């Protein structure tokens, strides 16, 4: 692999942009291109994410089953019983599964690793002002595809295991009461922290010469050292990929659906990838400064 060496002088170029939002506004056109690239990449793993949603998410959220969803809609009393047909419920169910699948991709839990590391490499060069889209993407794919595929598989397996454990303890199959609640909360916290770690994994793969083990070790350390910001970004991810899409679709109908698609096409994935690279640079700069 031939990643560019990380030196403190590179960060000086980033700092001249005077903050994240000014940097993002200046680079939005490039972020838009990166968003399109990531959207294509995520389409390739969307089927995998959809399988995870259909097989494991109902263990945590039973409404992700058509019959349970129908019961929930009827219990709310907000819709006349005559309107709650199997066809309408199935349409809502598949829409929910679609949004949840994109959410797994947006949270970095089910990803196309080579595409994520390639766009991280490109965004790093965008931040230092030495970017060229096609060569950067090509180099990012060529240099890091093996480790990135490994990271994708690890993320998928860990995500499934954590979701399964949350659902298992929620069902009360082994424990009940406070013990089950504590176990479920523990695995939920692990899943949340795993999401925070994913913010740093692909930028580290793309930009630093580290062993596979050290990538995850440093991602965990960076998530801890930058915990308040990482949690803030995690909350932004939840808003962009869960709260906002569900609100738009179920409150504003076809107009909301169109707005959701626009967010996916123009903004959501690229914005999070850009934040991810920016956070990693700041974390690396802290390490460089402490080593001086």
Regions found by a protein language model. Give the residues of each.
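Membrane-helix boundary elements
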Residues: 163-201
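Helix-coil boundary and N-terminal low-complexity module in membrane systems
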Residues: 1-169, 196-199, 204-237, 241-292
């Amino acid at each position: 692999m031939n990643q560019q060496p990380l030196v403190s002088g590179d960060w000086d170029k980033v700092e001249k942009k005077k903050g994240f939002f000014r940097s993002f506004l200046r680079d939005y056109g490039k972020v838009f291109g990166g968003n399109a690239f990531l959207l294509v990449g995520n389409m390739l793993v969307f089927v995998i994410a959809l399988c995870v949603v259909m097989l494991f998410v109902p263990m945590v959220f039973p409404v992700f089953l058509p019959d349970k969803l129908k019961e929930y809609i009827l219990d709310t009393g907000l819709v006349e019983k005559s309107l709650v047909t199997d066809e309408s419920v199935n349409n809502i169910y598949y829409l929910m599964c679609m949004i949840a699948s994109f959410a797994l991709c947006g949270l970095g839990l089910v990803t196309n690793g080579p595409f994520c590391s390639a766009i991280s490499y490109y965004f790093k060069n965008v931040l230092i002002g030495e970017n060229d889209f096609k060569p950067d993407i090509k180099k990012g794919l060529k240099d890091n595809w093996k480790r990135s595929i490994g990271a994708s598989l690890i993320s998928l397996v860990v995500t499934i295991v954590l979701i399964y454990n949350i659902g298992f303890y929620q069902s009360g199959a082994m424990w009940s009461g406070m013990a089950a609640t504590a176990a479920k909360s523990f695995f939920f916290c692990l899943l949340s922290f795993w999401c925070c770690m994913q913010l740093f994994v692909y930028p580290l793969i793309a930009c630093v010469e580290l062993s596979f083990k050290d990538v995850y070790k440093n991602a965990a350390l960076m998530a801890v050292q930058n915990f308040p910001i990482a949690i803030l970004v995690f909350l932004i991810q939840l808003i962009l990929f869960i709260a906002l899409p569900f609100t738009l679709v179920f409150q504003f109908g076809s107009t909301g659906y169109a707005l959701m698609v626009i967010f996916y096409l123009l903004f959501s994935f690229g914005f999070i990838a850009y934040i991810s690279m920016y956070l990693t640079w700041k974390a690396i700069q802290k390490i460089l400064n402490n080593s001086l």
